[in-house]
């Protein structure tokens, strides 16, 4: 017993001693964490260079765009062929995907040889061989008569400009077929298939084995966004933000980047860690000076590295008592599979003895221990280096996402990772130390990269079908110039109907006389109160207007909320609330004594019989207060003031917000004769010739007409351009069948149109993984401000995702792109429709005056116009295209329509004074 313990102790001491000797001998191969972190930094820099348009031509890490933009989402289906060429054998698979049965994937495959004479022969020989194997495979399965979609895993560095094209940059591994470098491998394969003429195949996608691995694992885990191969060769790919990929147009979404990291160090950046053995391996390789990182880490070279170390140590008398055999000196006699066998925990030393005996060196126990440790150092260095480069990718992903902690999945394949007994454990452990702020799940690709090629093909098919359906849906929102000219023509016809006495009562566009007969002339003077009611907020203003050489307008205002229960309660409650707010404001300003003139901006359709009387025709914008429609709102206000018995006011003018906006801008710019509001609601007004206003006596001069154009289309004249979504929004609104034009244009409804489209797309599985969340079911969730933010050019997709998350919608990058697209289509149509309406107005003014050209200014207000990044530009462009004989300027109303109400009141007071004197 004691003897056995002594023997074990002696053997352990002996082993430790041998290990220390080897550690010392191979010191250069043992990399500290500090060195590995430095390598991470270097690789991160190389990645950046590869992605940059300026540095890519000279970058060693090529960072090749793959044009794979999306990982599987589980809805893929179909029957696909996959070719997998890149190693010692060539595999063909038939992959049948059925998403209805728990993502069921049925695969059958066959392996074909790629003999040396073919991989080192001509390109046409190689692709003839591939085409022959594919024909044999299809013949056996009786599918030669089908034009099957084919995914091609081609595991060599390729330049791609689309997913079904791949120009070989350089052969790697043992391949050297002539005439292929610089050529499109898809064309070469298609040519070989065509030459045979006995079957047809549609090559939909070419992918690298790394991309194939990511896609294979991505089918099982949708968080998989990195692919890693550690086998005969090594490489990695990951999903990069498109905005960082200079070589590809566009900045929306993500694309898989094939790093081709095997070439890391080809520019000399790893010389400080390369050893004499690495240099010797490189000198004896098929591609000296290339793939230097791969030659330090991949399965093709590890066995050879160990052999070179053993030869040198034997020559120096440190192993095998200096014995060197012809076998030990022969390249390829010591393989990576031998390294794996020797590093096994229990039988490793026994395996070492067997393998070394096969090489004829008659090893001692010491030799076996030493050789085992040499293998450990070489394979451990490989694991450490791969951990460093993968760590750089993970840090980049984390920074791209802007999250303090990354959670992701890495799909892995390759014989070294799979079969080496210690490799994966060491690799994971090092990675955790290097990137402690990343939680990484490693998912082994059980089916190789061939299934991934089929998945890329399936995704390409799914995306093409989705794209077709999305385009089909959104096409209904695209308006041609002819369609817009027709809208302009119809608006003009409706305007005429509203102006004529005979047709006015039945007209949809009411063309209401405002009794505002002129714009300010600069002589207005005095202090005026203004009320502004038109949305969920209500403003009370004190406006001090001073005339003279230096005209000034000084304003003080306070905003009050109108609760929903008052908006939809009784008329008395609404006007009592308004008077209560006025009372508070008069106290706040200390002006409750004198009877002041007041202008009331009342932004709802009213029939006016004079400047100070407006009979409400209908409520819009969510208001539903009872006992108001059909009554004079000025009288309702006066009655409420009387009920309060605190103060008195002189209600001089009832004006629409659009008229107020026109007057505000006309005070600054005399050519302003049109007012436009595009905010919660939408409306326009303009100065019409009195002779055309049949509803008011007299035909001298002009009068501002409040068009109430929101009701355009209420008679069905826009039904041919209204979509299914417009009808849905209308149906569920408070005023179904009314304000149809407004519901296609204004901020109150655009978000609802978007929401309904998103629900439809989610039901079809195009968005949010097909899950309709509670927030998405909530009406009114998409406010104008969110649409404006989402469509901002300055906003990266991450910020779009953040906005959607704020709304309770968890989106992927692809989801964010589609949401942004939908918002853009809906808001573009709104701007074009608004422009068509405005074109009708300015052309009418021009024709009224018999002018060949008209110069006119439009005063504009409203949140959609002000805040949306593209609305105003598209609207201006539309007006320009549809009314080429009008030079139209747009002036933003900075002070809102309240100031306009005060100016109208001032004009009214001036005219009243003039009349009485």
Curated annotation (Swiss-Prot):
Membrane topology, as annotated: Peripheral membrane protein
Hexokinase small subdomain 2 as annotated region, ranges: 521-655
Modified residues (N-acetylmethionine): 1
Region described as Hexokinase large subdomain 1: spans on this chain: 208-447
Amino-acid positions noted as binding ATP 2 in the UniProt annotation, renumbered to this chain: 532-537, 680, 747-748, 784-788, 863-867
PROSITE patterns: HEXOKINASE_1, HEXOKINASE_2
Ligand binding (ATP 1): 30, 84-89, 345, 425-426
GO cellular component: cytosol; mitochondrial outer membrane
Stretches for region Hexokinase large subdomain 2: 656-895
Classification via CDD domains: ASKHA_NBD_HK1_meta_rpt1, ASKHA_NBD_HK1_meta_rpt2
Binding site for D-glucose 1: 155, 172-173, 208-209, 235, 260, 291-294
The keyword Cell cycle belongs to this UniProt entry's keyword annotation: no
Regulation: Hexokinase is an allosteric enzyme inhibited by its product D-glucose 6-phosphate. Hexokinase activity is inhibited by N-acetyl-D-glucosamine.
Leading EC class: transferase
Compartments it resides in: Mitochondrion outer membrane; Cytoplasm, Cytosol
GO MF annotations, alphabetized: ATP binding; D-glucose binding; fructokinase activity; glucokinase activity; glucosamine kinase activity; mannokinase activity
Disulfide cross-links: none
Quaternary structure (record): Monomer. Interacts with RABL2/RABL2A; binds preferentially to GTP-bound RABL2. Interacts with VDAC1. The HK1-VDAC1 complex interacts with ATF2. Interacts (via N-terminal spermatogenic cell-specific region) with PFKM (via C-terminus). Interacts with SMAD5.
Family assignment from sequence similarity: Belongs to the hexokinase family.
Known role: Catalyzes the phosphorylation of various hexoses, such as D-glucose, D-glucosamine, D-fructose, D-mannose and 2-deoxy-D-glucose, to hexose 6-phosphate (D-glucose 6-phosphate, D-glucosamine 6-phosphate, D-fructose 6-phosphate, D-mannose 6-phosphate and 2-deoxy-D-glucose 6-phosphate, respectively). Does not phosphorylate N-acetyl-D-glucosamine. Mediates the initial step of glycolysis by catalyzing phosphorylation of D-glucose to D-glucose 6-phosphate. Involved in innate immunity and inflammation by acting as a pattern recognition receptor for bacterial peptidoglycan.
Protein's name in the database: Hexokinase-1
Originating species: Pongo abelii
């Amino acid at each position: 017993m004691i003897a056995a313990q002594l023997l074990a102790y002696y053997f352990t001491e002996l082993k430790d001693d041998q290990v220390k000797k080897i550690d010392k001998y191979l010191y250069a191969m043992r990399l500290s964490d500090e060195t590995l972190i430095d390598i991470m930094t270097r690789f991160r820099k190389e990645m950046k260079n590869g992605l940059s348009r300026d540095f890519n031509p000279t970058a060693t890490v090529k960072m090749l765009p793959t044009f794979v933009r999306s990982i599987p989402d589980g809805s893929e289906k179909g029957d696909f062929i996959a070719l997998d060429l890149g190693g010692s054998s060539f595999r063909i698979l038939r992959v049948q995907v059925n998403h209805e049965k728990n993502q069921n994937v049925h695969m059958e495959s066959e392996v074909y040889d790629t003999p040396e004479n073919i991989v080192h022969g001509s390109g046409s020989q190689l692709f003839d061989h591939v085409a022959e194997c594919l024909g044999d495979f299809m013949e056996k399965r009786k599918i030669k008569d089908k034009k099957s979609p084919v995914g091609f895993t081609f595991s060599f560095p390729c330049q791609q400009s689309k997913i079904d094209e791949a120009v070989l940059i350089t052969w790697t591994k043992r391949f050297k077929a002539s005439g292929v470098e610089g050529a499109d491998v898809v064309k070469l394969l298609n040519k070989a298939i065509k030459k045979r003429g006995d079957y047809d195949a549609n090559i939909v996608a070419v992918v690298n084995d790394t991309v194939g691995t990511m896609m294979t694992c991505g089918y099982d885990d949708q968080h998989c966004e990195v692919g890693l191969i550690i086998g005969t060769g090594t490489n990695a790919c990951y999903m990069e933000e498109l905005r960082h990929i200079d070589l590809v147009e566009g900045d929306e979404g993500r694309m898989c980047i094939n790093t081709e990291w095997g070439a890391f160090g080809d520019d000399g950046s790893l010389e400080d860690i390369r050893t004499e053995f690495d240099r010797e391996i490189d000198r004896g390789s098929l591609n000296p000076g290339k793939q230097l990182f791969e030659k330090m880490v991949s399965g093709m070279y590890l066995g050879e590295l160990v052999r070179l170390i053993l030869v040198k140590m034997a020559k120096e008398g440190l192993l095998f008592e200096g014995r060197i055999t012809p076998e030990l000196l022969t390249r390829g006699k010591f393989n990576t599979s031998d390294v794996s066998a020797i590093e096994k925990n229990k039988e490793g030393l026994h395996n070492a003895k067997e393998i070394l005996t096969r090489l004829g060196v008659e090893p001692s126990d010491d030799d076996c221990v030493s050789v085992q440790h040499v293998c450990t150092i070489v394979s451990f260095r490989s694991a450490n280096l791969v951990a460093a480069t993968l760590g750089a990718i993970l840090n980049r992903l984390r920074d791209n996402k802007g999250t303090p902690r990354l959670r992701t999945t890495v799909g892995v394949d390759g014989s070294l990772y799979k079969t080496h007994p210690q490799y994966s454990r060491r690799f994971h452990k090092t990675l955790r130390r290097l990137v402690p702020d990343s939680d990484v799940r490693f998912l082994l690709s059980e089916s190789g990269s061939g299934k991934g090629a089929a998945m890329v093909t399936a995704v390409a098919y799914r995306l093409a079908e989705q794209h077709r359906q999305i385009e089909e849906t959104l096409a209904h929102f695209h308006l041609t110039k002819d369609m817009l000219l027709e809208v302009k023509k119809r608006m003009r016809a409706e305007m005429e109907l509203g102006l004529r006495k005979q047709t006015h009562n039945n007209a949809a566009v009411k063309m209401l006389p405002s009794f505002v007969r002129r714009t300010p002339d600069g002589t207005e003077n005095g202090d005026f109160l203004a009320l502004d009611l038109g949305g969920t907020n209500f403003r009370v203003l004190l406006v001090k207007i001073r005339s003279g050489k230096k005209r000034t307008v000084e304003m003080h205002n306070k905003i009050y909320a109108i609760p929903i229960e008052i908006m939809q309660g009784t008329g008395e409650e609404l006007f009592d609330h308004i008077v209560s707010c006025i009372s508070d404001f008069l106290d706040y300003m200390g002006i409750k004594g004198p009877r002041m003139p007041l202008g009331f901006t009342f932004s709802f359709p009213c029939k006016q019989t004079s400047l100070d009387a407006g009979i409400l025709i209908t409520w819009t914008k969510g208001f539903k207060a009872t006992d108001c429609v059909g009554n004079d709102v000025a009288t309702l206000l006066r009655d409420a003031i009387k009920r309060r018995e605190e103060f008195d006011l002189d209600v001089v003018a009832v004006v629409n917000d659009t008229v107020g906006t026109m007057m505000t801008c006309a005070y600054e710019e005399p050519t302003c004769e049109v007012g436009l509001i595009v905010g919660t609601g939408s409306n326009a007004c303009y100065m019409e010739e009195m002779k055309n206003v049949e509803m008011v006596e007299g035909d001298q001069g002009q009068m501002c007409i409040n068009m109430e154009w929101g009701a355009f289309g209420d008679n069905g004249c826009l039904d041919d351009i209204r979509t299914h979504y417009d009808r849905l929004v209308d149906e569920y609104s408070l005023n179904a069948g009314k304000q149809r034009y407004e519901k296609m244009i204004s901020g109150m409804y655009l978000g609802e149109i978007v929401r309904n489209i998103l629900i439809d797309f989610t039901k079809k599985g195009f968005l949010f993984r097909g899950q309709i969340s509670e927030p998405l079911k909530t009406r009114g969730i998409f406010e104008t401000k969110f649409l404006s933010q989402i469509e901002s050019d300055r906003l990266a997709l991450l910020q779009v995702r953040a906005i959607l998350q704020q709304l309770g919608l968890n989106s992927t990058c692809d989801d964010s792109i589609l949401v942004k697209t939908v918002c853009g289509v809906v808001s573009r149509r709104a701007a074009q429709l608004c422009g068509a309406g405005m074109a009708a107005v300015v052309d009418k003014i021009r024709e009224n005056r018999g002018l060949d050209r008209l110069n006119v200014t439009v005063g504009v207000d409203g949140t959609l116009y002000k805040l949306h990044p593209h609305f105003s530009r598209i609207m201006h462009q539309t007006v320009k295209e549809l009314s080429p004989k009008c030079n139209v300027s747009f002036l933003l109303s900075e002070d809102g329509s309240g100031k306009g109400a005060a100016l109208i009141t001032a004009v009214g007071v001036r005219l009243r004074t003039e009349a009485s004197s």
